[in-house]
C-alpha cells in the first residue's frame, strides 16, 4: 500500500505488537508508538514556528533517536528535510543556508545565526501528540554537496515523500529488516538506508559514533542483516 512517509510510524504502530522497538541508539530505545507521538508533537511545534507544506527544514542534529523524530515531523508538516552536520563552521553553514533558505533550522550551532531556529535540546512541550494531516512533501529529501566546485549545492530528490509498504524497499532492504547504521546521518547513504529500514517496518540500530569493536558486538546482539560501511570503517574492523 502506498502511504505518506509521514504516516509510517503510525502505520507500523497500529500493526506491530505493542511496545515493538523501532530505533535504538545505545540504551535509548524508541517504540513505533513513541516515534509517532513524539513526531506529532514536533510537527505541531514546527508549524507553530512557521513551517508550511512545501518548505525546507534544515536538521543539524547528531545521530540519535531525536533525529528521526525530527525527520518524520518535517514530513508531517508537508515539508522536505535537509541534514547538515551540526558542527559545520559558521561561514560554511551560512553559505548552505543561503542556498537552501529553510523556514526552520533544528539544531546546529548558535553562531549559525539562523533567523528561525530551535536548539539541539529542544523539547516540544505542550503540543498534542494526536495524528497530523498535511499534504505530502513534493521532495522526500534535499541533501547538500560541495561537489567538484566546492560551492554548496542542494540536491533535490524528486521522489515525493511516499512509500510502498507491501513490497521490499530499495537496495534489497527487506520488510522487517534488522539494520545497523554506523555512519553520520548528515551523509546521504546513512540517511537513506536508515529511513528505508523504517519504511520497511524494520528495527534500526543506530550508532552515535562509529567504533569497530562495538559494531561487531551490535551485529551479533541484534542479528543484523544489513549494514553499510565505507572503506575506512572496513579497514578499522
PLM ranges: what are they?
Residues 56, 62-82, 86-90, 100, ...:
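A short helix-loop-beta submotif of the ANL/AMP-binding
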Residues 31-33, 139-164:
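Conserved AMP-binding A3 loop
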Residues 36-41, 153-175, 235:
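Conserved structural elements of the adenylate-forming
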Amino acid at each position: 500500500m502506498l502511504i505518506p512517509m509521514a504516516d509510517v510510524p503510525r502505520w507500523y504502530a497500529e500493526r506491530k505488537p505493542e511496545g515493538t522497538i523501532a530505533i535504538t541508539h545505545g540504551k535509548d530505545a524508541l517504540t513505533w508508538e513513541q516515534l509517532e507521538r513524539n513526531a506529532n508533537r514536533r510537527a505541531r511545534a514546527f508549524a507553530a514556528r512557521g513551517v508550511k507544506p512545501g518548505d525546507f527544514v534544515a536538521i543539524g542534529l547528531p545521530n540519535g533517536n531525536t533525529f528521526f523524530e525530527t525527520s518524520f515531523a518535517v514530513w508531517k508538516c508537508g515539508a522536505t528535510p535537509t541534514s547538515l552536520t551540526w558542527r559545520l563552521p559558521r561561514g560554511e553553514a551560512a553559505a548552505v543556508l543561503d542556498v537552501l533558505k529553510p523556514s526552520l533550522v533544528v539544531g546546529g550551532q548558535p553562531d549559525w545565526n539562523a533567523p528561525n531556529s530551535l536548539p539541539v535540546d529542544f523539547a516540544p512541550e505542550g503540543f498534542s501528540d494526536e495524528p497530523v494531516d498535511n499534504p505530502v512533501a513534493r521532495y522526500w529529501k534535499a541533501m547538500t554537496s560541495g561537489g567538484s566546485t566546492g560551492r554548496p549545492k542542494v540536491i533535490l530528490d524528486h521522489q515525493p515523500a511516499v512509500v510502498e509498504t507491501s513490497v521490499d524497499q530499495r537496495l534489497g532492504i527487506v520488510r522487517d529488516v534488522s539494520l545497523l547504521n554506523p555512519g553520520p546521518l548528515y551523509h546521504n547513504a546513512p540517511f537513506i538506508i536508515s529511513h528505508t529500514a523504517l519504511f520497511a517496518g524494520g528495527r534500526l540500530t543506530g550508532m552515535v559514533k562509529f567504533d569497530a569493536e562495538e559494531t561487531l558486538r551490535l551485529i551479533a546482539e541484534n542479528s543484523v542483516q544489513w549494514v553499510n560501511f565505507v572503506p575506512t570503517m572496513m579497514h578499522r574492523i
